[in-house]
């Protein structure tokens, strides 16, 4: 272990402190690295990568309300086909992301790909919606679900108090924020353990369903009442694809994955196949015991299923749902903080978010920023509406990211591509993405209008804070002072070298 005498080094153009500047913290330990390089470390193995993806995809939805697909398809067999097709569709998207991730090895995933391909303006729109609304809202919602299931045994006959639910959700987020600030290995261990727990719960449900199936409980597996309207089909796929959301999360932290060219495609392929199999079999298990009417009317399908079959052991499922949501909160925080970090590295968010803690080598400011935004959304009474308004933007941005693949083939054919996808797959994926986003937008014009307004709010922010370079001196000095102060509080510096492109 070596020490640096002084804090953080050279002054950047914006005035933040860098590695060799004399400062008040003397000495400061830093990691034993060649040239004492301060950067995010590649600590994640293939198994860690798989658990990040699986743990991020599987939240509470499959346990609580896997009903959206059934609602729009109208029949059990049609819903199972949509679940399967959605898994295949997500795997195709992940296959395209494997080429992009191995070619553009930057944290930030689709944000980084859009930045490299279409420039800063479109990339900022994606960054704004995802960082300011989608990610913190999603984390707050999953944390609230965790709280409800933890408190349910304490309040068996009524809904848990709202204040208690929100306080416990805040505690959940804060604990995981500490873990993510302390050590990436700790965060990945949490992800591993809670991913195993949720898979164990789903395998219990699947095995119980298999027993029911082999004993002749097949009366609900029909195509009766199947809805064949185009709008209904699109909405059913929209619901199914939403359940698979998270397959691209490993791309957000690719700088911390060991041997990404080898491990990224493997992790994506294994995770997508595993999740698709588990989702389809879990849904089949539910319908061996519950009718479509019971599934649509249940507040928590897995709990109703367990009460019907497991008797005195039915309490296990709510516990596993709580464990599942805790792991999902960790997955969102782990990957989302890297999106803040990636945006700041491109100069589109405050410079402090590029900083790395000098002894723990974690993006502490980015983790804390994500945590604070989630806390703010916990104070809102209508966070579910916010996430619904901009949900279509997520799929549009993923479609634009996949469009980067053929575009870069055309404009930069000499880029090194360790993986080369057949262009048939991105073209099919882009067309399907347009179908499952435009039709629901037509079906829900009011929500779409609100969502578009939220997206358009990024434009004045971009021109005021990103595109405008010659800001008043007083403003710049204020930003420098705040950045230096936060650096000293958190003991963070900017990384030494840029990511590979």
Locate each region found by the language model.
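Helix-loop-helix junctions that connect adjacent transmembrane segments
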Residues: 16, 35-40, 79, 157-164, ...
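Hydrophobic alpha-helical segments and their helix-loop junctions in multi-pass secondary transporters
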Residues: 148, 196-224, 284-288, 398-415, ...
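Transmembrane helix-boundary motif of multi-pass solute transporters/channels
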Residues: 34, 41-144, 241, 250-251, ...
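Hydrophobic transmembrane alpha-helices that form the core helical bundles
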Residues: 68, 90-173, 177-181, 186, ...
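TM-loop-TM module centered on a large, flexible mid-protein loop between adjacent transmembrane helices
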Residues: 110-113, 119, 152-157, 236, ...
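Transmembrane alpha-helical segments of multi-pass small-molecule transport proteins
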Residues: 82-86, 154-184, 202-205, 363-373, ...
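Terminal cytosolic tails of multi-pass membrane transporters
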Residues: 1-43, 405-425, 446-501
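Transmembrane helix-loop boundary segments of multi-pass membrane transporters
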Residues: 70-74, 78, 154-163, 184-194, ...
